[in-house]
Amino acid sequence: AGGELVRFTTQGSREAENMKNINAGIRADGYQTPLVADVHFNPNVADVAALYCEKVRVNPGNYVDPARKFIKQEYTDEEYAHELQKIEDRFVPFLNICKEHHTAIRIGVNHGSLSDRIRNRYGDTPEGIVESCLEFLRICKKENFHDVVISIKSSNTVVMVRSMRLLVEEMEKEGMNYPLHLGVTEAGEGEDGRIKSAVGIGALLADGIGDTVRVSLSEEPAAEIPVARHLVDYIGKKKGHLLIPAAACPSFDWLRPTRRETVAVGNIGGNNVPVVISNRINGESTICENKDATPDYIYIGGKMPKQFVPGQSYIVDYNVYETLNSKPETTGAKLYPIFPAMAMPLIASIKADVKFLTLQFGTPAEEYIACLKAHPEVVVICVSNHQNRLGDQRALVHEMMNAGLKNPV
């Protein structure tokens, strides 16, 4: 199927011992794919698996700490330190086995299996997830064991992304630089599972975070590989792109991003939910049979559609806006002009409650900033033909934030 690692769930000692036979069997068949044993609850199983696999995954939430029972218990600092020492006393012998057999490990934290100890001190939070991981990483660093990969997984993509970003920041503070494994737990099946995986994994890959990827679908394992490959290939196409000379807005919090403050222009921006614009400049019908799939706005360029739908909002090129707006066929429909950057001087000459302006990062900043400050009724359509389109679009938004602009994008 194209996977570069194969993970086996290893429930007990019998399964761990059988990894020896599995390893020998696939090597005899000529396969050199590394094997990963996924171990929960029993550190003794991890010890055995480390003898026969290239990597062993352990879960900090249940490696030494008992399975969580949602018991509330306050720990003094002394008691908490004692619990950490218990982890170290058990984890170090495992690291020694891994050193002897050149076995890598993955410290894999699951949002759903944080220990009661962590939850009682940090809550069910990204901070608790990250601390659960760092407790084990600090031992690895202390023991000079660096064949480590880290994963933080959750079925909640917001928690997953924020936790992984926070982990990267905390590792930098502590002088750590371990590779990161990305995945969304139980993403689901079909289109929903693929979208959820893309949201979580794709957001982090776009940040430059992530070294290995696993897509978790409720389907046959082989179906997961093409999805993961597509995500990796998509990001790989941006490799070596031209520098984007941008300056991040100082008020932007990378770990806790909030919605950018904007003014309301019609039903766009302010406290409104994001709108959907459909591009139909090639003459596609603007009539939607499925009312639930009707876009908020339809862009038709400079062409007359076969029929204007009463009540529907249309975006039309600025140079035909006044002509189309005066035609009887448009009665009942709502038309709004869109301007390219080169037509900014004409924005003031056309009357409309909502106007659209296409901008790309690199447009002379002084020119468009002055225009947008003078015309709060303008909504920016952020476009890009850069190899790293997302980075280019982020750069424009940060440039606007640095200028204090509140026009919707």
Language-model segment annotations:
Residues 23-28, 48-53, 95-102, 141-142, ...:
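Acidic (Asp/Glu)-rich catalytic clusters
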Residues 14-37, 86-102, 131, 135, ...:
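Alpha-helix-loop-beta-strand connector modules within alpha/beta enzyme cores
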Residues 31-72, 77-97, 102:
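Hydrophobic or amphipathic alpha-helical targeting/insertion segments
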Residues 19-20, 102-121, 267-283:
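N-terminal small/glycine-rich loop or linker at the start of catalytic domains
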Residues 4-8, 33-39, 56-58, 105-109, ...:
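Hydrophobic faces of well-ordered beta-strands that scaffold small-molecule active sites
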Residues 77-88, 96, 119-269, 351-354, ...:
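Catalytic alpha/beta core domains of metabolic enzymes, predominantly
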Residues 3-26, 60-82, 148-157, 299-310, ...:
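Glycine-rich, proline-tolerant flexible connector loops at the mouths of alpha/beta enzymes
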Residues 10-52, 284-286, 307-308, 321-331, ...:
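N-terminal active-site wall of soluble small-molecule enzyme domains
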